[in-house]
């Protein structure tokens, strides 16, 4: 391990002065444990278990975003219908999406989440349509509510839970009981005096520890670009994305048309400039070892995954 790695471990020990020394000792031991897991995992290709079958991540994969909401720049309608959802899903599948991530409650910064009943109403429409049309598709549900996750897996056989909250409420125990892969997102306040990647690694390792103790076997980590992070912090995180390999788990990046690109450019998220910035960011993320890119625009991003 290089000098930067050791320096960052030392810095991370000051994240909370009130935390007992033994906590940091445990943290360091976990970092070393994950480092050795990483070394051993290099002997075989990374994969996740989807309903008893290994889904390889040896080559990067494309996760298509399907927003069953009425306030998304990528997909907006006043009355969400199966036909509208299917049109988006069909386009993504035809363009080469490896998995479909369906969300029915906007989680973009500044948005007001709909209540649980409305989220489930929208999600049922989307899942019924997509599962019927594409029974073999790998489906992910984007939700921070454990109850929604349980119903999605039980009623529609959803394959993956994508949770931007970092595991609030009963999410961790629910995912453990459901036995499905879980996407863990960094979503916590940042300390301006510490390197971004150090804070993200510290947070994710603690959460992964908790998930593993509960019996969750397949975890994908998402550094959470834009969540509780400034534009500068998100860009720093992208530059240092390879640091996250110390955790030894597949990395998903959600960079698609994020404000970290369109705000500095002074353009709208729907603009061509925002799209091109997304493509270049995804290209960089893959070069730094990302296993999954989560995107609105499949066709233009798919070619990035043919070569690492």
Q: Where do the model's predicted regions map?
A:
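N-terminal amphipathic alpha-helix/helix-capping segment at the start of soluble metabolic enzymes
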Residues: 43-70
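Cationic, amphipathic, low-complexity segments that mediate targeting or membrane/lipid association
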Residues: 1-33
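Catalytic PLP-binding core of fold-type I/II PLP enzymes
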Residues: 66, 129-143
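Structural preference for beta-strand elements that scaffold enzyme active sites
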Residues: 61-65, 99-101, 138-140, 159-160, ...
């Amino acid at each position: 391990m290089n000098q930067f790695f050791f320096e960052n471990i030392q810095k991370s020990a000051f994240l909370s002065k009130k935390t007992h020394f033994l906590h940091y000792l445990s943290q360091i031991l976990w970092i070393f444990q994950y480092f050795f897991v990483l070394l051993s995992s290099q002997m075989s290709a990374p994969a996740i278990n989807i309903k008893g079958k290994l889904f390889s991540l040896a080559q990067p994969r494309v996760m298509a975003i399907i927003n069953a909401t009425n306030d998304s720049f990528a997909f907006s309608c006043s009355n969400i219908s199966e036909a509208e959802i299917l049109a988006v899903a069909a386009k993504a599948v035809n363009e080469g999406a490896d998995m479909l991530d369906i969300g029915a409650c906007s989680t973009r910064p500044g948005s007001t989440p709909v209540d649980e009943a409305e989220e489930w109403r929208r999600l049922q429409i989307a899942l019924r349509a997509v599962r019927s049309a594409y029974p073999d598709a790998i489906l992910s549900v984007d939700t921070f509510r454990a109850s929604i996750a349980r119903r999605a897996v039980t009623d529609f056989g959803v394959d993956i839970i994508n949770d931007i909250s970092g595991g609030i409420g009963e999410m961790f125990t629910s995912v453990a009981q459901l036995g499905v892969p879980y996407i863990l997102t960094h979503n916590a306040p940042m300390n301006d005096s510490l390197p971004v990647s150090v804070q993200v690694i510290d947070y994710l390792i603690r959460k992964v520890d908790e998930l593993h103790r509960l019996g969750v076997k397949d975890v994908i980590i998402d550094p959470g670009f834009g969540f509780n992070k400034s534009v500068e912090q998100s860009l720093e995180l992208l530059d240092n994305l390879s640091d996250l390999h110390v955790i030894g788990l597949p990395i998903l990046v959600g960079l698609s048309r994020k404000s970290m690109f369109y705000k500095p450019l002074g353009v709208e998220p729907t603009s061509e400039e925002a799209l091109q910035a997304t493509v270049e960011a995804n290209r960089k993320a893959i070069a730094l070892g990302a296993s999954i890119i989560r995107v609105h625009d499949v066709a233009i991003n798919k070619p990035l995954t043919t070569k690492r």
